Amino acid sequence: RQSSNFFYLTGINNPSMLLIITKISSRHSTTLVCDRPNDIDKIWHGQLPSKSFYKNEFEIQNVLYSDELNSLELNDAKNMYFEFADENRLNQFIENLNLSQPQSRYLRNNTSRSTKIDLSNILFDMRRIKSKSEVSLIRHAAKISANAHVNIMKSCKSGLKEYEVEADFIKHCMSERCEQAYPAIVASGKNACVLHYTKNNSTLRSNSLLLVDAAAEYDNYASDITRTIPISGKFNEFQKKIYEIVLKAQTMAIKACKPGKTLIDIHNVAVKYITKGLIEAKILTGKLERNIKEE
């Protein structure tokens, strides 16, 4: 999968690329470094895009092939911003670019003399504010995910394997040109108590519950949905009571999502209501504050 930061800055999904943004006084320029197309790559992967394609399609000012990297003047840079400033990770990153030895040496030499600054937090702050088009992509991914969840709710039954449910979910997403946002958790019965259960190989049993944490990703924008459903198609009274506690907590947490609120503020709203509900259901004992503190 493409680096989210690289995709955010370029919109490009192709691998083995380097984006260099330079600023001299008030002037700045962008340079994309990519592999030179060759006949072997064409046989294995198809025709690679040309320089003009990247310039025109993605509005990149300059495009260099990796064997032309030393034509780019980097040795006067006082500060260099990387997605990571750790020396070992930087060296590993350069190695993963599959450059020739002279080009790798050139890049290492010209980065070693500069002050390295971690760019990731700056990019995270930028990415936190979504444009209308980004919100639209996320909504689309969420809609596909929701439909896939509804689909498996309808087809779920005793005797199926967890991986069959997962396959059904993936099939629906792929039919809508979506990938998986993360490895699916499809956990029936006690498996749902394992926070990151990924074996997905148990058999679904009547009167048990099935937890599905799975979601679609569309054009590198992800959704994230978790739902718990009755395998038999209907909750018993106890299951229904717990479900309603969780549903109400979710509704209250969503209402708490307002400007100025932090994630921990919203988390605490849900925790307080769930804890209160579990005490009333006699699953937890003791005072509300004490249970929350020990959570």
Question: What would you call each of these model-derived segments?
Answer:
Residues 1-295:
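Active-site neighborhoods and metal-handling regions in enzymes and metal-associated proteins
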